[in-house]
Amino acid sequence: MSLLKERKPKKPHYIPRPPGKPFKYKCFQCPFTCNEKSHLFNHMKYGLCKNSITLVSEQDRVPKCPKSNSLDPKQTNQPDATAKPASSKSVANGLSAFDSKLQHSSAREDIKENLELQARGTHRCLGQKPALHRASPCKSPAPEAALGAQPALEGAARPSAFVPVGEHRLKGPDNAEAPETLALHNPTAKAVSFHTKSAFHTPGYPWKAGSPFLPPEFPHKISSTKGLGAISPYMHPTIPEYPPHFYTEHGLATIYSPYLLAGSSPECDAPLLSVYGTQDPRHFLPHPGPIPKHLAPSPATYDHYRFFQQYPSNLPIPYGFYRPESAFSSYGLRLPPVTGLTRDQSSHLLEEATLVYPASSPSRLNPSDPNRKHVEFESPIPEAKDSSKAGQRDTEGSKMSPRAGSAATGSPGRPSPTDFMQTSQTCEGLYDLSNKAASSALGRLYPPEQSLTAFRPVKKSTECLPAQAAETTAESPVSLNVVNGDPPAPTGSASLVSEAAPSSPDDSSGMGPLNLSKKSEINLAATHEPTYQGSPQAETASFSELQDLPLNLSVKDPCNTQAPRPAFPGRPRAAEPAAAVPQKTGTEGSEDGPSHPETKPGSLDGDGAPPTGPGEEAPDACAVDSSEEQKQTAAVALCQLAAYSPRNIRVGDGDAAAPEPACRQDTPTLSSMESQEAQCDLRPKGQKRTSLRDAGKSQQGAKKAKLQDTARVFTLRRRARVS
């Protein structure tokens, strides 16, 4: 008992008496108090306290009740405590009256019989004794604490005193007005009996497994049902609540609606509503039919529903998803263009919405850009190249400009062909990879128109190169790019800055990537530049410049890559429809280096198809790249070109790069290579980092350079992707 007393503070099984008053053991079940713990034990445990019997058993059944009971018991305990300060009297009265009923005889018998129980009873009594003291000062906390603590201590064998104390207190308030323990006891006992029957029998709360278990141990505890009786209203709502929960969760909107409307109990309804934010999904699933029903039953709930319904309505957007290009620019960036419906709008929307292409956004700012971009989007529809360009923009948004980024990509690592292709392939893979083959054909057919549009505007820069560009265009995409190298030479004089600035003039007016390559000496640079320009910037620039000037798009233009000259000269080639197609192939191959490198190993067609897309892109990319993007890419390209600028090698590289396309069309490649050697120097060196290798290899041999250039284009592709 002393141990239990020590535990008292921890787990108050007792209500402590006021410190000024002697320890009176109080029955937790009832106001009965006695200085003799044995009396309390007998009273509480052995049916001496009918309340304790009923309450404890019921509370065992309804473990949740104690706290609720403790709330009311607090009130009861206070009156009880008030009576209990004279708890000696209360004990005398309670013991006399109640014991006269049950306690004296049963208490003594129980004391004798229940020395075993006295351990528990002792716990209770000890708890009660301090509880009496504690009762007046902190009855409300103590009851709850006692309720919570004693069950933990006694576990299965809860002291009826502990749990029932709260229960009794609940009852106590009913009888609390009677200061005498007897008055409280008798009415409480009666009420407890009644509640026990009502709560214990009526509640039908067998859901609490404790009830059958505890009653056997403490049949007297059944009186705890009194507390349950008070709680039972809640319990019943809880029980009804659960079925509605399940039904509603099952999506029985009708059930749920009635449930919400009728509501088993307002308590449950509010929690259920809050809980049933998930109801929205249920309703959402059946929403086609049930939605009206749901809306009728619970508008508040359907606010969530409406939100979810909107969400599903957004879900349809995946197929309507291309209409909101701006919304789904990353996904549908190319797709809306593919539809060709919102090419202009979609292009702008996608560009704007797709901040993924920061550089492309600046290019969009370019006046020409809208047309270019639209063309670009148009080309993506037919060609994967445009998509690859978009993909590269996505990937190269960091690099500089998505379109100008071809140069930027090239300058970072000559990835422009690679980046363009691989990045584009990544994004492009969604729908553009499929489009690529078709795009090759379509690109040549349809893109030539757009390319022509792009190319012809770009032609401003195209000087002598347009003829060469046309020649090379038909002959070799790289050749075309090489031819493009010459006109870019003046523009390329600005080198990368020239690429940015001329890109703005050339691209803005010509819609083509800037010819930043000042080194016309390296035609191979032009060849590599196509690879570099193959990146979005090169793509864009090269289409514009293909019209204006034959671009040296050779992948092998590390030195000339210095000024990643957009295939601006090559764009003029595109000016010619036939040339435009090959130019697209060549220039795009060079520009869209990723596509081109990818295609290079494959064939001119592979190159050509992607270039066609870029040709269309070119207006977009040129405008975009010509502005900020190309400037930025030019800066990057200049840095790279500075790093990789063996101009002689570049000339060789240009030759190698041209031969690479030349492998497809050797003669045009040679012609363009010659043109490019002058112009290729102007070609951005950064277009192809392979150009350094290619330069050496080109010096070794054009064919060797061609083969290795193709391999390097792929290598560059990988590098560009990495960069």
Curated annotation (Swiss-Prot):
Consequence when changing residue 27 to A: Abolishes the ability to induce epidermal terminal differentiation
Polar residues bias: start-end ranges: 67-91, 360-369, 470-482, 530-545, 666-678
Superkingdom field: Eukaryota
Residues that span the membrane, as ranges: none
GO molecular function: DNA-binding transcription activator activity, RNA polymerase II-specific; DNA-binding transcription repressor activity, RNA polymerase II-specific; promoter-specific chromatin binding; RNA polymerase II cis-regulatory region sequence-specific DNA binding; zinc ion binding
Effect of residue 30 to A: Abolishes the ability to induce epidermal terminal differentiation
Pfam name, any one: zf-C2H2_7
Binding site for Zn(2+): 27, 30, 43, 49
Cellular component terms per the entry's GO annotation: nucleus
Subcellular location(s) of the protein: Nucleus
Function: Transcription factor involved in epidermis differentiation. Required for terminal epidermal differentiation: acts downstream of p63/TP63 and activates expression of late epidermal differentiation genes. Specifically binds to the promoter of KLF4 and promotes its expression.
Disease cited in the entry: Seborrhea-like dermatitis with psoriasiform elements: Characterized by a chronic fine diffuse scaly erythematous rash on the face, particularly on the chin, nasolabial folds and eyebrows, around earlobes and over the scalp. The rash exacerbate in the winter, with emotional stress and after strenuous physical activity. Hyperkeratosis of skin over the elbows, knees, palms, soles and metacarpophalangeal joints is evident. There is no arthralgia, arthritis or neurological disorders.
Name of the protein in its database record: Zinc finger protein 750
Organism: Homo sapiens
Organism ancestry: Eukaryota, Metazoa, Chordata, Craniata, Vertebrata
Gene that this sequence comes from: ZNF750
